Structure formats: structure tokens, C-alpha cells
């Protein structure tokens, strides 16, 4: 098991954001986590990457107690978090943003290979490598945010709402590139996404979070056939 989250609870000022959440991710798996706004999906990612502290429960990554490891060291273990809202460094160029993603020892030793892969996945970034990130379109900034994650040479890549605010055609392109990264590179992916149909279609296994709890889980086939999922999230 690459990642095991067991009975994880997280609170903000006494307000419970996650309540006893358990998630299991095998190496090479593509896992989707879906649910409404405020369900705790982003909080789950922040707990994995160490941005917010866990109140109780456990997170184990490749046999290590992740909660005992400082956030800045988790990237060295091969965990990369592509945050909601892209959060690129607007005043830096595209190439400088990618270099920032490669600051870890993993990223530095594989920089040349990774940059070639990033530019193969997102050719527009190669064309605009000297352009300031703040002048890119929303879709291009999302490509850059994903590329910055890839630059760290991750074994586990957390993708938080990569389609947020994007035109449908651009969101479709982003999903296609994410699927290619998983299929061709074997990177273990956890995707948080509100475009539920696309997320469940792409994943091997999925979880539905509501009000900070896992209410459903299963293969993409099982979840897309589930009446509750079809009514609440797929409009069927």
C-alpha cells in the first residue's frame, strides 16, 4: 500500500472538516475523490501534504508515519501537491516556475528528463518558457501548475480541482493530459474534482465525500452505476 489514511479527522477552530476519513491508494493507482463544495476534499489534500495538522487518525506513506514528517520534507519522499486555484508565481517566467518545482533532490537529479516530459505533455509551455506566468491564460497556468508538480519527479501526485474556472474544451484537454501522465508514466494520482463524470471515468477507484465523511467508495464502474451518484452528481 502506497498511501493509507485511517480515521483521519481535521478541524478548523472547532469546526470539523474531516470526520474519520479512511482512504487507501495502491502504487500506480488513479484515485478520484469527488463531492460537493465544503465536503473536505481540499482539506484532505492539505493534511496529506502537511499544510494543516490532523486532529486524530493516521496517514502512512510507504510504511512511514507521514504525520511525523515536516511538510517541507514530504516532497523529498515523492509527494507533490498541485493546489486548487493554480497558484503559479506570477512574476516569474514559465521556466522559472518549473525550476521552482524541481528544488528537491528528486527534482534536481531528473530535471532534464522531466522538463522534456512536461513540454511533451504541454507544448504551449515550451513555446512560452520565457513568458511571465502571470500573463498566461487560465488554462495555460493550470498546465504550468501541473508541470511544476511533475518537475519534482513525484511518485504520488495530488491534483486539486484542475478544471476549476476553465472552459470545457480546455478542461477536457487537461483531463486528457492527466490521463496520459498516469497511463504512460505510471505516476500514482489522486484527483479531487467537481466534474464528477470525467473524474470517475478516468479513475481506477473513487471516493465520495460529503460533510467531511466518506459516504461511498468503489471502482469507477460501480460508482457510475450507483443510483445515488447518478442522481446527485451525474444528473441522471
Annotate the PLM regions.
Residues 34-36:
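The feature captures the beta-strand-to-loop junction immediately N-terminal to the Walker
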Residues 57-65, 77, 111-115:
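Conserved ABC transporter NBD signature motif
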Residues 132-136, 140:
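Conserved ABC ATPase signature
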Residues 13, 69, 94-113, 121-126, ...:
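ABC-type ATPase nucleotide-binding domains, specifically the catalytic core motifs of the NBD
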Residues 172-186:
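Helical segment within the ABC ATPase nucleotide-binding domain
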Residues 49:
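Helix-to-loop junction immediately C-terminal to a conserved catalytic motif
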Residues 149-150:
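ABC ATPase C-loop
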